[in-house]
């Protein structure tokens, strides 16, 4: 931080910043946009390492498995490993394990990459079949969305199956000339069709996203700062979890 910037900070803010040991970094729209790395990202991450501040990647985007996210980061020139990643797929898995420990079969409205993450955790992905009844319905950001599967998800929602959404984002940031309809818009579609909202939405601003970081790395809430681009998800997560942001 420059001397001029330091002079503009209040004593209270300086004290809070002095406690920060770890950054929880959003990904889409924060360190990259679509397939484009922001020009400041590499230097920013290097500066944090030099300052002794660790970081992890905390994303509401469940469309990629952790393995596929690591491949993307590597292609962008960012060094990361599995321990650096916490996605809403992982948050949904943790939630289901905690709240529905007997659940084995899930209807997953999500990408093939996301589905592999759930299968890796030991779950069975139900088919688009009225006789293949799931224990839990999971609705996510599905870039491979098929109309029949959206209808099937709506059917299970109408039947009272436990219903978990991965994130409330209405659209996903992109560097392309299009609108990427995200999970929050898909759950609204299901709500209009069935009258039912998700039982829980595990992504930011849900505080459990940051609590997973506290537990994984052993930090206190006041030692973690949330960095992101969206007020209604990223910025709101920090106070919900007692962190800085």
What residues fall within each predicted segment?
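HAD-like aspartate-dependent phosphatase fold
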Residues: 1-27, 31-245
């Amino acid at each position: 931080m420059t001397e001029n910037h330091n002079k503009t900070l209040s004593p209270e803010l300086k004290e809070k910043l002095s406690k920060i040991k770890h950054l929880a970094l959003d990904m889409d729209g924060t360190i990259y946009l679509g397939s484009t790395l922001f020009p400041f990202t590499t230097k920013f991450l290097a500066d944090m390492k030099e300052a002794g501040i660790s970081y992890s990647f905390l994303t509401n985007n469940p469309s990629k498995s952790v393995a596929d996210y690591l491949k993307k980061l590597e292609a962008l020139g960012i060094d990361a490993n599995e321990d650096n990643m916490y996605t809403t797929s992982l948050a949904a898995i943790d939630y289901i394990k905690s709240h529905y420990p007997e659940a084995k079969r899930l209807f997953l409205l999500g990408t093939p990459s996301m589905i592999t993450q759930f299968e890796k955790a030991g779950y069975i992905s139900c088919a688009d079949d009225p006789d293949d009844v799931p224990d839990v319905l999971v609705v996510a950001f599905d870039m491979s969305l098929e109309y029949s599967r959206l209808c099937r998800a709506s059917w299970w929602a109408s039947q009272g199956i436990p219903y978990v959404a991965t994130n409330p984002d209405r659209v996903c940031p992109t560097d392309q000339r299009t609108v990427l309809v995200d999970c929050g818009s898909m759950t609204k579609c299901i709500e209009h069709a069935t009258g039912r909202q998700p039982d829980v939405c595990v992504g930011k601003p849900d505080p459990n996203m940051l609590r997973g970081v506290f537990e994984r790395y052993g930090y206190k809430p006041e030692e973690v700062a949330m960095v992101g681009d969206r007020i209604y998800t990223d910025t709101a997560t920090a106070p919900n979890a007692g962190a800085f942001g």
